[in-house]
């Protein structure tokens, strides 16, 4: 027997109904999650220009299970949560002051963006050259596939990890504790040249994240390698990079041209003010994986043959756009919308619809679209990634 529930007052103006301004739709009097309907207005009432079916292009970290440890937590969005995301997977992780993501390595490259707080990262490359650095909000790091590394919180911190394989799982990485726990002690004794009883205190299973002590300064912790430091830094200070500034916002692009070690991930940090939008465009070289940092917005994706769908996004959401699919992103809120665009590529690339039309013979564009002079004369030969609505 169903439990009795308080009836929904469907005449309440705060309760959205699936009725579009053109009259299409009807009142929804059945079971529903009103909060989700409010958060996804363009899924609940799609724009009249939406048509056809597109795979889901949105998943929220709020819907991803947490892995809780002493020293921090983590959660992931992979192809298992967002099936279309075959190129990239993402992990949201937090560490306490002194919390350690243990020494480990991956088959995939790791790109990271610091969301808040400070952390220390270490790594050693295949030639015995080492690296140590502190990172803070807006800083990036990149570890190539197979490079062993660690992360430790200097204070409470949170960061986004991005991997160049949608099938990746943070919970199946190669860790030092797990390997040693599954290696016979006589083998460890031979490898390290010490008695077997020296390994009696080793963990019996994977540690993953643990609570440690806050380390001292980089200078006091740095180990001098006989082979020197890594030739290319694993750290990049993105917020210290001058942005491409526009009236409606800004863009900072980072790829192998200005962060040379980042061979498989390119990215852009995009700022869109209220009343502005990321212009109509597409990316010719890779799928796009997005992470929304602040604010709220909506994105419409066009994949051809009359098929376009609109999705709503807010802080903590992940978005996805297939390669070469046309799309735009609007700020639908009252605060600044910040998000990351990430690509499995060594270089960032996008094609602007406006610029393409401006650099094509005018008569050809006019005859193709039956466009008037007002539109044709307004086309821009230079790319403007973020544009403002007229009059705002």
UniProtKB/Swiss-Prot annotation:
Keyword vocabulary terms for this entry: Cytoplasm, Decarboxylase, Lyase, Manganese, Metal-binding
Cofactor(s) recorded in Swiss-Prot or TrEMBL: Mn(2+)
GO terms, biological process: oxalate metabolic process
CDD domains hit by this protein: cupin_OxDC_C, cupin_OxDC_N
Cofactor note as given: Binds 2 manganese ions per subunit.
Enzyme class: lyase
Gene Ontology molecular functions: metal ion binding; oxalate decarboxylase activity
Record-linked SMART domains: Cupin_1
Short name of any one Pfam family annotated for the protein: Cupin_1
Catalytic residues in the record: 341
Binding positions for Mn(2+) 1 per the UniProt entry: 104, 106, 110, 149
Source taxon at top rank: Bacteria
Residues reported to bind Mn(2+) 2: 281, 283, 288, 327
Region (Disordered): 1-25
Protein EC: 4.1.1.2
Subcellular location(s) of the protein: Cytoplasm
NCBIfam families registered for this protein in UniProt: bicupin_oxalic (TIGR03404)
Family under the similarity heading: To B.subtilis OxdC.
Protein name as catalogued: Oxalate decarboxylase OxdD
Annotated organism of origin: Bacillus subtilis (strain 168)
């Amino acid at each position: 027997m169903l439990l009795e529930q308080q009836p929904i007052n469907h005449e309440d103006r705060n309760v959205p109904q699936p009725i579009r301004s053109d009259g299409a739709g009807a009142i929804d009097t059945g079971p529903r999650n009103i909060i989700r309907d409010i958060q996804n207005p363009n899924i609940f009432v799609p724009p009249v220009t939406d048509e056809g079916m597109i795979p889901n292009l949105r998943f929220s970290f709020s819907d991803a299970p947490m892995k809780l440890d002493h020293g921090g937590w983590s959660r992931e969005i992979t192809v298992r949560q967002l099936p279309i995301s075959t190129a990239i997977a993402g992990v949201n992780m937090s560490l306490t002051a002194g919390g350690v993501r243990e020494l480990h390595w991956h088959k995939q490259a790791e790109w990271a963006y610091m969301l808040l707080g400070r952390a220390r990262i270490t790594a050693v490359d295949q030639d015995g050259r080492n690296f140590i650095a502190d990172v803070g909000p807006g800083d990036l790091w990149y570890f190539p596939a197979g490079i062993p590394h660690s992360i430790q919180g200097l204070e409470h911190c949170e960061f986004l990890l991005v991997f160049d394989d949608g099938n990746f799982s943070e919970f199946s990485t190669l860790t030092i504790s797990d390997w040693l726990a599954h290696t016979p002690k006589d083998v460890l004794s031979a490898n390290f040249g010490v008695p077997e009883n020296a390994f009696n205190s080793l963990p019996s299973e994977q540690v993953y994240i643990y609570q440690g002590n806050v380390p001292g300064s980089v200078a006091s912790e740095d180990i001098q390698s006989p082979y020197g430091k890594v030739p290319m830094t694993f750290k990049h200070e993105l917020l210290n990079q001058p942005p491409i500034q526009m009236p409606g916002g800004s863009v900072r692009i980072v790829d192998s041209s200005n962060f040379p070690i980042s061979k498989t991930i390119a990215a852009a940090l995009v700022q869109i003010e209220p009343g502005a939008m990321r212009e109509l465009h597409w990316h010719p070289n890779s799928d796009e994986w997005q992470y929304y940092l602040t604010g709220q917005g909506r994105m419409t994706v066009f994949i051809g043959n009359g098929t376009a769908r609109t999705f709503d996004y807010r802080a903590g959401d992940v978005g996805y756009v297939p390669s070469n699919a046309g799309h735009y992103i609007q700020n639908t809120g009252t605060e600044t919308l910040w998000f990351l665009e990430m690509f499995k590529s060594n270089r960032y690339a996008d094609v602007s619809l406006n610029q393409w039309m401006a650099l094509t013979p005018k008569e050809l564009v006019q005859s193709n679209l039956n466009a008037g002079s007002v539109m044709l004369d307004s086309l821009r030969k230079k790319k403007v990634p973020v544009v403002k609505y007229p009059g705002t």
